[in-house]
Regions:
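Extended, charge-rich alpha-helical interface modules
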Residues: 22-86
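Short, Lys/Arg-enriched N-terminal segments with co-localized hydrophobic residues
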Residues: 2-20
Length: 86
């Protein structure tokens, strides 16, 4: 026979596990976005400090704009996570 206290314990434990998993997923999403932001930021730094060293990118401005678009994409993800799930 299952006691009410056992059901309560099970529900509390399940709820805690769900919260832990939720936080781990959100943290992973945030770190993923932050990593991509840093990657694209560093690319821009390279283009700004040594534009002639990047032979396959003849239009530096356009190339930097593409990197900025990627930063904006991942920053939007971070903003949404914080606003709706944080």
């Amino acid at each position: 026979m299952i006691l009410i206290s056992e059901i309560y314990f099970y529900n509390v434990t399940l709820g805690l596990l769900e919260n832990i998993m939720r936080e781990k997923i959100l943290t992973a999403l945030e770190k993923h976005a932050q990593g991509h932001i840093e990657k694209h930021r560093i690319n821009i730094e390279v283009y700004l400090t040594n534009p002639v060293g990047i032979g396959e990118h003849s239009d530096i401005i356009e190339t930097i704009e593409k990197e900025l678009d990627e930063i904006a994409r991942y920053q939007d993800q971070l903003d949404i996570i914080k606003k709706y799930f944080g």
